[in-house]
Amino acid sequence: MEKVFERLMYASRWIMAPIYLGLSLILFALGVKFFQEIFHLLPNIFKIGEVDLVLLTLSLIDITLVGGLIVMVMFSGYENFVSQLDVGEDNDKLSWLGKMDAGSLKNKVAASIVAISSIHLLKVFMNAENISNDKIMWYLLIHITFVLSAFAMGYLDKITRTGK
């Protein structure tokens, strides 16, 4: 009975596989939004102001960072919790594939969230005249929380890895 239960539990990790595959659909949706923004920009390139262009650029960078985060979670999550990716050993293989454990994945995700939050906060500051001070304060507090959380997670990971 115990062996059957353990095998069933171990096999249940495959439930995560379609979820990781579903993230690729979100990645596709982000790509569509990215190019939609570019196609809206092109006809108006000579009419758009500098600040609006910078805000749009920050939005595109934001989408790119989120896309990178999705790729990182998709691949390393699949490798850590479902099965090893067998993509061959050619030049196309990502250098970090197979080398990122759950702890380092958490740190990379936290760093990505801080970067995304930084871009969003920069967009808020560039548009500060249209945003209430209360909202700016909350954006700043949330960003500081992300930064402190990422720092704490990195520090705890360092402590557990060194055993000190």
Curated annotation (Swiss-Prot):
Keywords: Cell membrane, Membrane, Transmembrane, Transmembrane helix. The keyword Transferase does not apply. One of its GO terms (cellular component) is plasma membrane. InterPro entries: UPF0114, UPF0114_bac. The chain crosses the membrane at residues 15-35, 53-73, 109-129, 136-156. It holds the Pfam family UPF0114. Its main location: membrane. The keyword Protease does not apply. It is a multi-pass membrane protein. It is found in: Cell membrane. It comes from the Bacteria. PANTHER family: UPF0114 PROTEIN YQHA (PTHR38596:SF1). Belongs to the UPF0114 family. NCBIfam families: HI0507 (TIGR00645). This is UPF0114 protein Sbal_0780. It comes from Shewanella baltica (strain OS155 / ATCC BAA-1091). The lineage of its organism: Bacteria, Pseudomonadati, Pseudomonadota, Gammaproteobacteria, Alteromonadales.
